[in-house]
Amino acid sequence: MSDAAVDTSSEITTKDLKEKKEVVEEAENGRDVPANGNANEENGEQEADNEVDEEEEEGGEEEEEEEEGDGEEEDGDEDEEAESATGKRAAEDDEDDDVDTKKQKTDEDD
């Protein structure tokens, strides 16, 4: 019974993180997030992803191996974005705030 409750919570958390990730990506790219939250589909990015998938299917096995290597690099970018969505970037920002605070104290002492 407790497993079901945890399951529901994790689904909500995952959804929230996805939405937050989209907001972060849109802010970094300078685009507004659509009201329905389907940023990729409205901006045509979803269609571009589908075209890449079709090219991979049509390509030979040799091309797939090369693309898999490229995919690993892209996965690294996604991991960085996911980390920022989970608060790692927020923690780094907090560290910056601490530095600013120290500078202010130094300025006041002078």
Curated annotation (Swiss-Prot):
Keyword Nucleus appears in the UniProt entry: yes
GO CC annotation terms, alphabetical: nucleus
Compartment(s) where it occurs, according to its Swiss-Prot or TrEMBL record: Nucleus
Chain positions found as N-acetylmethionine: M1
Basic and acidic residues bias spans: 13-31, 100-110
GO biological process: negative regulation of apoptotic process; positive regulation of transcription by RNA polymerase II
Pfam families: Prothymosin (PF03247)
Cross-link (Glycyl lysine isopeptide (Lys-Gly) (interchain with G-Cter in SUMO2)): K102
Endpoints of the signal sequence: none
PTM-bearing positions, type Phosphothreonine: T8, T13, T14, T101, T106
Gene Ontology molecular function, alphabetical: histone binding
Family: Belongs to the pro/parathymosin family.
Protein's name according to its UniProt entry: Prothymosin alpha
Species assigned in the record: Pongo abelii (Sumatran orangutan)
